[in-house]
Structure formats: structure tokens, C-alpha cells
Amino acid sequence: MTNIFNAMRVTATVGGKEIVFETGRLANQADGAVWIQCGGTVVLVTACSQATDRDLGFFPLTVEYSEKMYAAGRIPGSFFRREIGRPSERETLVSRLIDRPIRPLFPKGLKDEVQVLANVISSDQNNDSDVLAVTGASTALGLSSIPFDGPVAGARIGRIDGQFVINPTIKEMERSDLNIVLAASRDAVVMVEGEASFVPEAVIVEALEWGHKEIQPLIDAQLKLREMAGKAKREFTAPVEDADLAARVAALATADLDVALRIPEKMARKDARKAVKEKVMEALVADPAYAEDTTPLRAVGDILSALEKRIVRERIVREGRRIDGRDTTTVRPILIEAGILPRAHGSALFARGETKSLVVATLGSSTDEQRMDSLTGDVTKRFMLHYNFAPYCVGEVKPVRVSRREIGHGALAEKALRPILPLGEDFPFTLRVVAETMESNGSSSMAAVCGGCLSLMDAGVPITAPVAGVAMGLIKEGDQYVVLTDILGDEDALGDMDFKIAGTSEGITAVQMDIKVKGLPTDVMARAMQQARDARLHILGEMGKVLEAPRAELSAYAPQHAEVFVNPDIIRIIIGPGGKNIKAITATTGASIDIEDSGRVSIFAPTLEAMEMAREMVQYYDQRADIGKNYTGKVRKVLEIGAIVEILPNLEALVHISQLDTNRVEQASDVARLGEDMVVKVIEINGDRIRASRKAVLLEEQGIEWKPEDTARPSGPREGGRRDGGRDGRRDGGRDGRRDGGRDGGRRDGGRRDGGRDRN
């Protein structure tokens, strides 16, 4: 322990790294606060609570994770240059990551508002802050007076070259085929979230077992710090159930509820349960015992919920039959339609029982990539999956906004599909998949995975293998564990586990697990994994009946793509001054053009015709002159010895005065006028120097065959015909066209040039 300004500190070593826990230096007015550090990454986590008289019907826990840009020495990119507005997607996901393992550890019936804030105040961009925040939240709550049945600790498990690594660095994760975040108590893993590259089920189970052992020092450190600096927990008395009322409700409702909870259809079952509650309330209100005070009847809803839970769980354990009549391993009936939307790039309708998802895939250009401001700098994403859960999908009326749950489910489905996508070099499109939940009765996020895969295949995206997902449940009664395949919404609420697993026939790509029981034996987890694999293979088989492979061609309404490789030296010419040329191309064709320094030009256009036009316009700036080919160019300069003609963009040729016409030309300006078009034939290319002839074109027009010797280079210039710094299409420092060692006497005498050959 180190005492710094009344601070108390403990350390733990995990995976060879020191984790520092410190309290008492910052945020001392919070009920609980901890500074948790690994390397140069520091997260400050605080916990506060506030009593409330309101009965919200749920535990009002708020968890907010925030990344401060100063932590990485950066200034926010917003207009106000501060962290304002909605949390980023990562901040939302990490907030959920913290919330899920700690929420079940508060006593049932606690109504106080509890707020946990985790602020990243230093980031070395090497050690990730999310798992520190999970452990820090448990530590802050443990130090506070808030009733909390912790501790739990968080860690990341990677696998590099076949070896498990705990809390690998961000750079090390680039080589890992496994990325699992787990939270665990002393006795068991309580939360799992992760992605993998087609990893077998057995490896996941082994990773969780290994990780649980490795994080025990973090549990020890929390307990030690709590012993040193923790506050006494305030007393909390859980609400006592009215035994007489519970017995009366059970007598009135058990038989009817048993019947209602055998109705397979969700909405009909909901109506039947509602009718049972109304019948019970009607009988109780008429009871003289409650004539004067009906306050106790507020508990009827909770009593009925507990009764429903008992009926369903006992039936599953005793009979092996579930609410909709299935056994424990059967997947609900599956219906699939592909290409359901006529103008979408790719679409699919995936239905599993009463859960139905309409999923749409859209292809875009590289300019459509999502750009985000983060601690590690500007980050781009070329694949996005957005999950929507509108109120109508469960027959409710609620405000319409994107919830944390929707962001979390979308992120899970995105993880599941990411490993099967083609590399950007092979398929440079930006991909967006939107999953619209049409109806929901459990496992809607896994329906988004299945439908998302089908929509990508319908769009013609060359995925490496199909992916499917399924949600597993658990009923634990005493020492009995019953694993449920493809759980309903009611089974999720009444059960002890929600374990979502997605993958291909070869292995797992994404997992998410939340459990409500204290511990889960390894053999039970392995059984859940195996049942999930059997279900996944069944679902993949059903998907294969509709689409065996991605469509061979992209949708006619999808962007068209082409790549052109140009000389890097002419990139500035393609772009033009102030982007003039590139803007003209995009305005004319509607194409999106991305030019790399290597000379690689990616063209995305709305139609095939527009793409071809854009390609031609780009290639126009990268043309090469060919000897013997005619070009229509513009006269850029008129000299005494001839004219400079731009035959191609930024490519000029010298037309010597002797090649301006079939007749003798006294002055080049007699034939060549600045800015006018001139058709010329390229007659010589010597490195960067190009010579052209208008005379050759005129001879051909007269039916006289052009021969190279007809345009032989003249022996010398006319009198006074030296170049004095003007451009001549050559890079010879302005030397004249003579081969006489540079003498410049050359006056005309009797039609001959001194020291020269006859003119042609």
C-alpha cells in the first residue's frame, strides 16, 4: 500500500502486466471512486446513488462510459472542440459491457437510482480501456455504501499462434483469431462478448475456463482495497411478499395460467394472460379484506409473474416441453425469401417462428465509409450493420429512437458477419446492412445475422461462407440444468441464460452470453455449445435451400466499379487546378472517384454507362502518343521554327516549320494560330521529346502515302531560327534542330542553308 495525499493503492499482476487500483485521491465526494490503470491507460470510475420514492417497475441503474480526447493528447473534432452530443458507438457498447455483469448483482427490489460513470482520462493507445472500466465499475461499487454483491472482474482473451493471451495489446490483437471479453466473479463467468475467426466450440469453452483462472488476482485486489478503504454497506431490506395474497392469487390463477402458457402464439398467449390477471383482480377487489385498502393489490402483477415463471420452469424440467410445445432441442419453423425488395441491392426476409426480420444490403463507394473520431485517431469502417427494433414489432407504442439495445444487437450481428466478407482489395465496396425487425418473439438479433448473410448473398457480395446464429437458454432447478435451443422471448425472461452463438459450418464468429445463476459448470456450457452447433447447421441447411451461393452478378441498381492504373506523375493533372478536372468528371458522370498515390484509381458509378464514361475520361489524361498516329490538338505556342501543339492532355509536340504544310512556309504564324485546332501526325518520339507533322496529314488527305523518310529531320533552321527559351516539345535546353555541333550561322543563300543539307 502507498499513501499519497490520503490515497490508498493496491496492485495486481495479470498476464505479466501490473494493474493499479487507487482510491482517495480523486472524486472523494462520490460514494465510491477508483483510479484503475494498466500501462499508460487510466480509467476513473465513480459510483453514486440517490434514494427515490418512485416505483419505476425496474431497477434504475445508469452506466455511462466516456472517452476523453485529452486522454490521448487530441482535441475533439466537433465545432465546439469538446465532447458533446450523443455517445459514440464504442462508448455505448462499452457502457453495455459494464452494465451487463453488474446489474444482476444488486439486490432484488432495490429502487434507488444508481449511476456509474467511467471516464478514460489517459490512453497509451496500447492497453485497451474497456476491460479496465468493467473491473473499475465493480471496484467503485464495492468501495461505496451501495448494496452490491460483487466483486466481478473483466478481461480480454486473445489467441495468438494457438496460445491464449490475457489482455493483449491493441497491436497484438491484430494477430489474434479470438477476441473475447469476459466478466467473472470468484466462482463463475457471468458475461461473455466476443468475436472469432471460425474458432471451434471447444476452443471457446477452453478460453473461458482459462480466462476465469487468470483474472482471480483482480478479484483479490478488489477485496483487499475494499477492506482497506470501503464504506459500510447501508442496510437494505428486500420487499417481503404478502404470503396470504400470494396464496390467494395462486389459487385463483394457477389453472388458468397453466392453460394460457401452453398457447403457442405470442399475442394470443399475451391476451390470455391478461385475461387471467383481470379475472384475479376482479375477484380480489370484491374480497372484503381489500375493500378499504387496495394498496396490497399493486403486488398482484409481480406475484403473477413469479407464478408464470414457476409454471413454465417446472413444466420444462418435468415434461421436457416448452411454451410452444417444442422439446428442448428443436428449432422453430424457418421461412426465407430472397430478393424481396425490387430496387434494393440485396434483400432477404428471414422468419423463425414468430420472429421475422427484413434485412437489406446496400453497396456504396469508398466515400461512403464511416469515419469516426476516436482516441486512436480517425477510424474508418467499410462494413456497417444497423439493427432496428420499432415498437410495432411487439405491438407496442413507444418513442421512436435508436436505443442502446439496438446498437448492441447491431454490433453483435456485425461481428458475426465481418469474418466472411471479402477483402477490400478484392471487393472495394462499402457495405451497409440494415435489419428491420418486423416481428419479435425472441432471438431477433440472430435473425438479423441470418437475414444479413442472405441479403449480402442476394446482393452478389462474394462472402467466404454462409453464417447463421441461434440463441440458447437455460433452466436451472436444483442440480438440474436444461439447455434450450432457439429460445422464445418469454423463455429469455423466465430463464437463467441468454447465450447467442453465430458462425459458419466450420466454427464460431460471434458469441454473447449473460447468465443469471451464480455459476455455470463447464460441461453445461459445452452442451449448450454443441446444441447451438446442431441448430446452426440446421439453419444453414435451410438457408442453402434458398441461396446456395452469392449471386454471380451485382444488382443492376448497385454501383458499378472499375479500377484504372495511371502514371502517378499525372495524378495532379487528373485532379486539375483546384480539383477542376475531377469535379468535371464527377459532375458529368455522377461517379465517385478515389485516387491513391500509387496511381490506382477507383471509380464507382450509378450505371455501367456512367462508369465507362468516367473511365474513359480518366484515361484521357493518361494517354501515350504513338508514332504514325494522328491527333487533333491545340496550338499552344507559335515559334519562328514552328509550332507547339498539345496533342494530348499535358503532352506537347513540336511541329517544325518544314512540317506545317506541303508548300514552303515562310512564317509559322502563316499556318499556325494560337488556340486553334491542328491535326498532326506523330513522326518521332525520343524520350520526352515528340515531333509531329501537319504536312504528313495533308499528304494522306491527297492520297499520297506517308513514309517516315518524307518527314526526315531538316539539317538546320532558317536564318535567325534559334530557340530562345521557348517550349518546343523537347527537353534539350532550347537547342535548335540542327546536327552541326550547335553552329547558328544559317542564313538562306540560293535556296540552300550554309553547311546544311537540302530541304525536303
Swiss-Prot record:
One of its GO terms (molecular function) is polyribonucleotide nucleotidyltransferase activity. Residues 628-702 form the S1 motif domain. Its cofactor is Mg(2+). It holds the Pfam family RNase_PH. It catalyses: RNA(n+1) + phosphate = RNA(n) + a ribonucleoside 5'-diphosphate. GO terms for cellular component: cytosol. Residues 706-760 are annotated as: Disordered. Mg(2+) binds at residues 492, 498. It is found in: Cytoplasm. GO terms for biological process: mRNA catabolic process; RNA processing. InterPro entries: ExoRNase_PH_dom1, ExoRNase_PH_dom2, ExoRNase_PH_dom2_sf, KH_dom, KH_dom_type_1, KH_dom_type_1_sf, NA-bd_OB-fold, PNPase. Keywords: Cytoplasm, Magnesium, Metal-binding, Nucleotidyltransferase, RNA-binding, Transferase. It is an enzyme of class 2 (transferase). Residues 719-760 have a biased composition (Basic and acidic residues). Its EC number is 2.7.7.8. Gene3D superfamilies: GHMP Kinase, N-terminal domain (3.30.230.70), K Homology domain, type 1 (3.30.1370.10), Nucleic acid-binding proteins (2.40.50.140). SMART domains: KH, S1. Its main location: cytoplasm. Residues 559-618 form the KH domain. Involved in mRNA degradation. Catalyzes the phosphorolysis of single-stranded polyribonucleotides processively in the 3'- to 5'-direction. NCBIfam families: polynuc_phos (TIGR03591), PRK11824.1 (NF008805). This is Polyribonucleotide nucleotidyltransferase. It comes from Nitratidesulfovibrio vulgaris (strain ATCC 29579 / DSM 644 / CCUG 34227 / NCIMB 8303 / VKM B-1760 / Hildenborough).
